[in-house]
Amino acid sequence: NYKRSLRAAFFIAIEDDCVRKNPFSFALNKVLEDNRGEKTVLTPEQEVSLIDFVQNDKVYRKYVDELIILLGTGLRISEFCGLTTNLDFKNRLIRVDHQLLRDPKSGYYIETPKTKSGYREIPMSEPVYQALKRVVKNRGKKTTIMIDGYTNFLFLKRDGTPKVGMDYNNMIRNLLKKYNKQHKEPLPNI
């Protein structure tokens, strides 16, 4: 993101004849190595095994609906965290038109999808539909802070603030560790 902003700023500086060359007009992947671990999609059998494990685990059972929704929709974590009570249960659709993010310095903020294909409607399978119904019911009438015009986020922390990707990254990492300790066939990094 920083590189994109700097590149745009230098492009304008070139247009205004303030500088001759754009020092940020290079492909970042030529300079930095992508050291993120490869993500693997779970097989249907692995998904069932993970959900069964979570349902029977004293620590992680409270996350079962969240995992069902994540696995059943393929939402990005920030899109998932941005879900509000404004769901189309009649047509069983999840409309994706924003994502919830949090910056350590500036706090929570909403971002719209970067491309047209990011705006989409995701059909609710029966398990996802039932999980969302339970989440809305268990959430009750709690009101949450308004973030860039959005309120009533579905997934809240104990203090009433919305959960963000980092909250789930830690939970999922620890869940997978525990699952893999107890099963012969470990799950891949997801």
Regions found by a protein language model. Give the residues of each.
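Hydrophobic recognition helices of helix-based DNA-binding modules
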Residues: 6-14, 132-135, 175, 179
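Short, basic (Lys/Arg/His-rich) helix/loop patches that form interaction surfaces
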Residues: 52-63, 73, 122, 138-153, ...
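Conserved tyrosine-mediated DNA breakage-rejoining catalytic core shared by Y-recombinases
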Residues: 29, 82-140
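Short, basic/aromatic-rich helical patch in the C-terminal catalytic core of site-specific tyrosine
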Residues: 6-10, 80, 172-173, 190
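Non-catalytic DNA-binding core/recognition domains of DNA-processing enzymes
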Residues: 1-12, 27, 124
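Gram-positive cell-envelope targeting signals
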Residues: 3, 40-42, 79-81, 163-168, ...
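Basic, Lys/Arg- and aromatic-enriched nucleic-acid-binding interface segment
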Residues: 15, 19-77, 81, 90, ...
